[in-house]
């Protein structure tokens, strides 16, 4: 029987085991491989598991272990999914795939396009909140660059450039978006410091917030930082203790907020099919959330 799990720290709060159980009705084992040391956790994967999900703070270290990189993984420099294959350990990035799926749901210009798998088929009916009712194929048709002109000129602000932030930036770039990067630690001229948050927020049509706590600069936002004619689309990665959810409600129709549980669901739905080779039950997965 195949065996799967999650490595990272801390992960006791993770919804992944419940999501995985719902996805396949308890057919497969899925363990939390808790530990602060990456090498110890990775060794357990090699010795005991067929494939694993990877979460913070191990995404970059896991990327370095891979023998084979999927296209989306190569574009991010991080992985959240390692699979044993006859050719070696293959790395994927379903954070990337989940963001592309979210963008396809919330961005009007993407209607009729099927990222992250252009050859798949979209379910006609949706659950409340726009959740797709079924998983799509995980095989790529063509290159990630096939849709690079689709959202040219759309500005997206990525706040926080850890593993999830890198994936979000790469996914946005693959659709031709103008990506504004921001991080606590600024390592290059293409990355803005947090002090620039309000200025960059004003410019952006879409904001993906990946920092696990509220930054002081959030308090400076006012109605004047939003567009009059079109709401800003906001995705927050942290679903356990969100910083923006209540704040964005105060701006009414000027902001459309999406919680991290949707990103979690979309990356899980794409990732679990890669792990197992079987389509997950999205309806049961969404019930967990």
Can you say where each PLM-predicted feature lies in the sequence?
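Phosphate/diphosphate ligand-binding glycine-rich loop within oxidoreductases
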Residues: 2-107, 246-247, 256
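Rossmann-like NAD(P)-binding element
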Residues: 197-220
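ADP-ribose/adenylate-binding Rossmann-like module
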Residues: 81, 226-264
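NAD(P)-binding Rossmann-fold cofactor-contacting core
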Residues: 174-193
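Active-site capping/gating segments
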Residues: 101, 105, 256-288
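Short glycine-/small-residue-rich Rossmann-like dinucleotide-binding loops
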Residues: 57, 208-213, 238-239
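Intrinsic disorder/low-complexity segments
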Residues: 108-152
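Glycine-rich adenosine-cofactor-binding loop
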Residues: 8, 90-96, 103-107, 152-173
């Amino acid at each position: 029987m195949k065996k799967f799990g999650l490595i990272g720290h801390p992960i006791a709060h993770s919804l992944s085991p419940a999501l995985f159980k719902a996805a396949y009705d308890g057919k497969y084992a899925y363990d939390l491989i808790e530990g602060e040391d990456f090498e110890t956790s990775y060794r357990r994967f090699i010795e005991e598991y067929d494939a694993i999900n990877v979460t913070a703070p191990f995404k970059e270290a896991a990327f370095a272990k891979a023998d084979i990189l999927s296209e989306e993984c190569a574009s991010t420099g991080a992985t959240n999914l390692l699979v044993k294959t006859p050719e070696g350990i293959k790395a994927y990035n379903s954070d990337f795939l989940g963001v592309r799926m979210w963008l396809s749901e919330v961005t009007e210009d993407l209607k009729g396009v099927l990222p992250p798998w252009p050859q798949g088929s979209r379910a006609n009916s949706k659950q409340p909140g726009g959740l797709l009712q079924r998983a799509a194929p995980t095989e790529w048709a063509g290159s990630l660059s096939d849709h690079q002109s689709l959202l040219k000129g759309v500005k997206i602000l990525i706040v926080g450039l850890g593993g999830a932030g890198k994936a979000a930036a790469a996914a946005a770039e693959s659709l031709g978006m103008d990506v504004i990067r921001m991080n606590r630690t600024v390592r290059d001229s293409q990355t803005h410091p947090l002090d620039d948050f309000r200025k960059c927020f004003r410019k952006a049509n879409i904001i993906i917030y990946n920092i696990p706590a509220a930054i002081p600069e959030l308090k400076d936002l006012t109605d004047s930082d939003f567009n009059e004619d079109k709401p800003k689309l906001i995705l927050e990665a942290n679903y356990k203790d969100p910083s923006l959810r209540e704040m964005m409600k105060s701006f009414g129709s000027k902001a459309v907020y999406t919680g991290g549980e949707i990103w979690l669901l979309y990356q899980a739905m794409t990732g679990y099919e890669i792990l197992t080779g079987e389509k997950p039950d999205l309806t049961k997965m969404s019930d967990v959330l």
